[in-house]
Protein backbone atom coordinates (compact mmCIF):
# COMPACT_ATOMS: atom_id res chain seq x y z
CA UNK A 1 0.00 0.00 0.00
CA UNK A 2 1.34 3.39 -1.01
CA UNK A 3 1.51 5.90 1.82
CA UNK A 4 1.12 9.66 1.69
CA UNK A 5 4.77 10.25 2.55
CA UNK A 6 6.15 7.89 -0.08
CA UNK A 7 5.90 9.91 -3.27
CA UNK A 8 8.27 12.00 -5.34
CA UNK A 9 5.64 14.17 -7.05
CA UNK A 10 2.60 16.09 -5.76
CA UNK A 11 -0.10 13.58 -4.92
CA UNK A 12 -3.39 14.45 -6.63
CA UNK A 13 -5.90 13.94 -3.83
CA UNK A 14 -9.63 14.09 -4.52
CA UNK A 15 -11.65 15.82 -1.80
CA UNK A 16 -14.99 14.01 -1.46
CA UNK A 17 -17.95 16.34 -0.83
CA UNK A 18 -21.21 14.28 -0.84
CA UNK A 19 -23.09 13.65 2.41
CA UNK A 20 -24.31 10.13 1.65
CA UNK A 21 -22.76 6.80 0.73
CA UNK A 22 -24.29 6.34 -2.72
CA UNK A 23 -23.11 9.74 -3.94
CA UNK A 24 -19.68 9.23 -2.38
CA UNK A 25 -19.25 5.94 -4.26
CA UNK A 26 -20.43 7.65 -7.44
CA UNK A 27 -17.85 10.44 -7.08
CA UNK A 28 -15.09 7.99 -6.15
CA UNK A 29 -15.79 6.03 -9.34
CA UNK A 30 -15.69 9.23 -11.41
CA UNK A 31 -12.43 10.38 -9.78
CA UNK A 32 -10.79 7.02 -10.49
CA UNK A 33 -11.69 7.38 -14.15
CA UNK A 34 -10.13 10.86 -14.15
CA UNK A 35 -6.89 9.46 -12.73
CA UNK A 36 -6.79 10.50 -9.08
CA UNK A 37 -3.89 9.28 -6.95
CA UNK A 38 -5.64 9.42 -3.57
CA UNK A 39 -8.78 10.47 -1.73
CA UNK A 40 -9.83 12.50 1.29
CA UNK A 41 -13.04 11.53 3.06
CA UNK A 42 -14.46 14.51 4.95
CA UNK A 43 -16.47 12.71 7.62
CA UNK A 44 -17.82 16.01 8.94
CA UNK A 45 -19.84 16.40 5.73
CA UNK A 46 -21.49 12.97 5.99
CA UNK A 47 -24.99 12.35 7.31
CA UNK A 48 -25.02 10.69 10.73
CA UNK A 49 -26.82 7.60 9.43
CA UNK A 50 -24.01 7.05 6.90
CA UNK A 51 -21.26 6.91 9.51
CA UNK A 52 -21.51 3.14 10.02
CA UNK A 53 -19.07 0.29 9.49
CA UNK A 54 -21.04 -0.96 6.49
CA UNK A 55 -21.09 2.48 4.86
CA UNK A 56 -17.41 3.13 5.52
CA UNK A 57 -16.46 -0.24 4.07
CA UNK A 58 -18.51 0.45 0.95
CA UNK A 59 -16.89 3.87 0.58
CA UNK A 60 -13.30 2.78 1.18
CA UNK A 61 -13.81 -0.38 -0.84
CA UNK A 62 -14.78 1.66 -3.90
CA UNK A 63 -11.40 3.42 -3.92
CA UNK A 64 -9.56 0.65 -5.78
CA UNK A 65 -6.98 0.47 -3.00
CA UNK A 66 -5.93 4.10 -3.50
CA UNK A 67 -4.67 5.71 -0.26
CA UNK A 68 -7.20 7.78 1.64
CA UNK A 69 -6.97 10.38 4.36
CA UNK A 70 -9.78 11.35 6.68
CA UNK A 71 -10.91 14.51 8.46
CA UNK A 72 -13.67 15.28 10.97
CA UNK A 73 -13.62 19.03 11.53
CA UNK A 74 -15.73 20.49 14.31
CA UNK A 75 -16.47 23.75 12.49
CA UNK A 76 -17.91 22.01 9.39
CA UNK A 77 -19.74 19.11 11.01
CA UNK A 78 -23.30 18.72 9.71
CA UNK A 79 -24.42 16.60 12.67
CA UNK A 80 -27.51 18.01 14.36
CA UNK A 81 -26.04 17.14 17.74
CA UNK A 82 -22.76 18.87 18.54
CA UNK A 83 -19.98 16.36 19.14
CA UNK A 84 -17.11 16.82 21.55
CA UNK A 85 -13.52 16.55 20.36
CA UNK A 86 -13.29 13.22 22.14
CA UNK A 87 -16.34 11.95 20.24
CA UNK A 88 -14.98 13.22 16.93
CA UNK A 89 -11.68 11.47 17.65
CA UNK A 90 -13.38 8.16 18.43
CA UNK A 91 -15.43 8.50 15.26
CA UNK A 92 -12.27 8.98 13.22
CA UNK A 93 -10.42 6.11 14.88
CA UNK A 94 -13.40 3.86 14.15
CA UNK A 95 -13.38 4.76 10.45
CA UNK A 96 -9.59 4.57 10.32
CA UNK A 97 -9.59 0.99 11.59
CA UNK A 98 -11.90 -0.36 8.90
CA UNK A 99 -9.74 -0.39 5.76
CA UNK A 100 -6.06 -0.83 4.96
CA UNK A 101 -6.05 1.97 2.39
CA UNK A 102 -7.05 4.58 5.01
CA UNK A 103 -3.59 5.83 5.87
CA UNK A 104 -3.60 9.53 6.80
CA UNK A 105 -5.30 10.86 9.93
CA UNK A 106 -5.98 14.59 10.32
CA UNK A 107 -5.51 15.97 13.85
CA UNK A 108 -6.63 19.57 14.25
CA UNK A 109 -4.03 21.82 15.83
CA UNK A 110 -6.52 22.83 18.53
CA UNK A 111 -7.97 19.37 19.14
CA UNK A 112 -9.03 19.01 22.81
CA UNK A 113 -8.73 22.78 23.34
CA UNK A 114 -10.59 24.98 20.82
CA UNK A 115 -8.33 27.97 20.25
CA UNK A 116 -7.79 30.94 17.90
CA UNK A 117 -6.23 30.02 14.55
CA UNK A 118 -6.90 26.33 15.33
CA UNK A 119 -3.68 25.89 17.30
CA UNK A 120 -3.51 25.21 21.03
CA UNK A 121 -0.56 25.73 23.35
CA UNK A 122 -2.26 24.08 26.32
CA UNK A 123 0.08 21.40 27.68
CA UNK A 124 -2.63 18.88 28.56
CA UNK A 125 -4.22 19.19 25.12
CA UNK A 126 -0.83 18.83 23.45
CA UNK A 127 -0.11 15.68 25.46
CA UNK A 128 -3.41 14.20 24.26
CA UNK A 129 -2.60 15.15 20.66
CA UNK A 130 0.80 13.47 20.88
CA UNK A 131 -0.77 10.35 22.40
CA UNK A 132 -3.31 10.26 19.55
CA UNK A 133 -0.56 10.63 16.94
CA UNK A 134 1.31 7.76 18.57
CA UNK A 135 -1.84 5.62 18.51
CA UNK A 136 -2.35 6.26 14.80
CA UNK A 137 1.28 5.40 14.10
CA UNK A 138 0.88 2.12 16.01
CA UNK A 139 -2.10 1.37 13.76
CA UNK A 140 0.20 1.71 10.76
CA UNK A 141 -0.99 5.17 9.75
CA UNK A 142 0.46 8.60 9.15
CA UNK A 143 -0.60 11.84 10.81
CA UNK A 144 -1.32 15.26 9.35
CA UNK A 145 -1.91 18.16 11.75
CA UNK A 146 -4.05 20.98 10.38
CA UNK A 147 -4.69 24.56 11.43
CA UNK A 148 -7.10 26.82 9.54
CA UNK A 149 -6.55 30.41 10.71
CA UNK A 150 -8.48 31.49 7.59
CA UNK A 151 -6.83 34.90 7.71
CA UNK A 152 -3.61 36.23 6.28
CA UNK A 153 -0.61 35.61 8.54
CA UNK A 154 2.85 37.18 8.35
CA UNK A 155 5.61 34.62 8.05
CA UNK A 156 6.68 34.80 11.70
CA UNK A 157 3.19 33.81 12.87
CA UNK A 158 2.91 31.14 10.20
CA UNK A 159 6.24 29.59 11.15
CA UNK A 160 5.28 29.57 14.84
CA UNK A 161 2.21 27.47 14.08
CA UNK A 162 4.11 25.18 11.71
CA UNK A 163 6.88 24.50 14.22
CA UNK A 164 4.36 23.91 17.00
CA UNK A 165 2.66 21.29 14.83
CA UNK A 166 5.98 19.77 13.83
CA UNK A 167 6.92 19.18 17.47
CA UNK A 168 3.82 17.09 18.18
CA UNK A 169 4.95 13.92 16.47
CA UNK A 170 3.08 14.40 13.21
CA UNK A 171 4.25 13.54 9.70
CA UNK A 172 2.72 16.39 7.70
CA UNK A 173 2.14 20.01 8.69
CA UNK A 174 -0.91 21.74 7.18
CA UNK A 175 -1.93 25.40 7.47
CA UNK A 176 -4.63 27.27 5.53
CA UNK A 177 -4.66 31.08 5.54
CA UNK A 178 -6.06 33.75 3.19
CA UNK A 179 -4.84 35.88 0.29
CA UNK A 180 -7.11 38.87 -0.30
CA UNK A 181 -4.65 40.98 -2.30
CA UNK A 182 -1.73 40.64 -4.70
CA UNK A 183 0.62 41.55 -1.86
CA UNK A 184 -0.75 38.81 0.40
CA UNK A 185 -0.52 36.35 -2.49
CA UNK A 186 3.12 37.29 -3.07
CA UNK A 187 3.93 36.89 0.62
CA UNK A 188 2.24 33.48 0.66
CA UNK A 189 4.41 32.32 -2.24
CA UNK A 190 7.49 33.59 -0.40
CA UNK A 191 6.31 31.83 2.76
CA UNK A 192 5.95 28.54 0.88
CA UNK A 193 9.60 28.63 -0.16
CA UNK A 194 10.71 29.66 3.33
CA UNK A 195 8.76 26.83 4.95
CA UNK A 196 10.47 24.35 2.66
CA UNK A 197 13.76 25.58 4.06
CA UNK A 198 12.75 26.03 7.71
CA UNK A 199 10.70 22.87 8.35
CA UNK A 200 11.91 19.32 8.80
CA UNK A 201 8.54 17.75 8.04
CA UNK A 202 6.57 17.54 4.82
CA UNK A 203 4.09 20.42 4.72
CA UNK A 204 0.93 21.60 3.02
CA UNK A 205 0.50 25.39 3.06
CA UNK A 206 -2.60 26.65 1.27
CA UNK A 207 -4.80 29.71 1.22
CA UNK A 208 -8.33 30.75 0.41
CA UNK A 209 -9.65 34.18 -0.42
CA UNK A 210 -10.08 36.29 -3.54
CA UNK A 211 -6.44 35.88 -4.66
CA UNK A 212 -5.87 32.23 -3.74
CA UNK A 213 -6.13 30.46 -7.10
CA UNK A 214 -2.54 30.91 -8.31
CA UNK A 215 -1.23 29.68 -4.97
CA UNK A 216 -3.61 26.71 -4.93
CA UNK A 217 -2.35 25.63 -8.36
CA UNK A 218 1.37 26.25 -7.89
CA UNK A 219 2.13 25.76 -4.17
CA UNK A 220 1.86 21.93 -4.35
CA UNK A 221 4.63 21.95 -6.96
CA UNK A 222 6.85 24.05 -4.70
CA UNK A 223 6.32 21.91 -1.62
CA UNK A 224 6.01 18.54 -3.41
CA UNK A 225 3.11 17.67 -1.16
CA UNK A 226 -0.56 16.87 -1.66
CA UNK A 227 -2.50 18.49 -4.50
CA UNK A 228 -6.01 18.83 -3.04
CA UNK A 229 -8.57 18.93 -5.84
CA UNK A 230 -12.08 17.92 -6.87
CA UNK A 231 -13.29 15.93 -9.84
CA UNK A 232 -14.79 17.44 -12.97
CA UNK A 233 -18.02 19.39 -12.42
CA UNK A 234 -17.75 19.61 -8.62
CA UNK A 235 -17.65 22.97 -6.83
CA UNK A 236 -14.66 22.73 -4.53
CA UNK A 237 -14.52 26.40 -3.59
CA UNK A 238 -10.81 27.28 -3.56
CA UNK A 239 -9.85 23.68 -4.39
CA UNK A 240 -9.08 23.37 -8.13
CA UNK A 241 -10.56 20.72 -10.35
CA UNK A 242 -8.40 17.68 -10.99
CA UNK A 243 -8.12 18.48 -14.71
CA UNK A 244 -6.50 21.82 -13.87
CA UNK A 245 -4.17 20.25 -11.32
CA UNK A 246 -3.01 17.65 -13.84
CA UNK A 247 -2.58 20.29 -16.53
CA UNK A 248 -0.36 22.39 -14.26
CA UNK A 249 1.74 19.34 -13.44
CA UNK A 250 2.06 18.45 -17.11
CA UNK A 251 3.05 21.99 -18.14
CA UNK A 252 5.61 22.15 -15.35
CA UNK A 253 7.32 19.02 -16.65
CA UNK A 254 5.89 16.60 -14.11
CA UNK A 255 4.39 13.43 -15.54
CA UNK A 256 0.66 14.05 -15.76
CA UNK A 257 -1.18 12.60 -12.79
CA UNK A 258 1.52 10.11 -11.84
CA UNK A 259 4.03 9.76 -9.06
CA UNK A 260 6.74 7.23 -8.45
CA UNK A 261 7.99 5.63 -5.27
CA UNK A 262 11.50 6.46 -4.20
CA UNK A 263 13.85 3.56 -4.72
PLM ranges: what are they?
Residues 259-261:
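Intrinsic disorder
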Residues 109-257:
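Catalytic alpha/beta core domains of metabolic enzymes, predominantly
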Residues 4-138, 142-155:
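Active-site beta->alpha loop and helix N-cap motifs at the rims of alpha/beta catalytic domains
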Amino acid sequence: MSLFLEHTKPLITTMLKPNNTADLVRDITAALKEGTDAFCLEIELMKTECRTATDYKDIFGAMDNKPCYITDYRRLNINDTEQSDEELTEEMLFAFSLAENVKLFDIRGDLFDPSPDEITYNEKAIEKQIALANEVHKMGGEVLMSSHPLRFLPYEDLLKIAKAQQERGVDIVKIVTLAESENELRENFEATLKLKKDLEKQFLFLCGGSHCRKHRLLAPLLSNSLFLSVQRGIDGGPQPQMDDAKKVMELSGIENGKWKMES
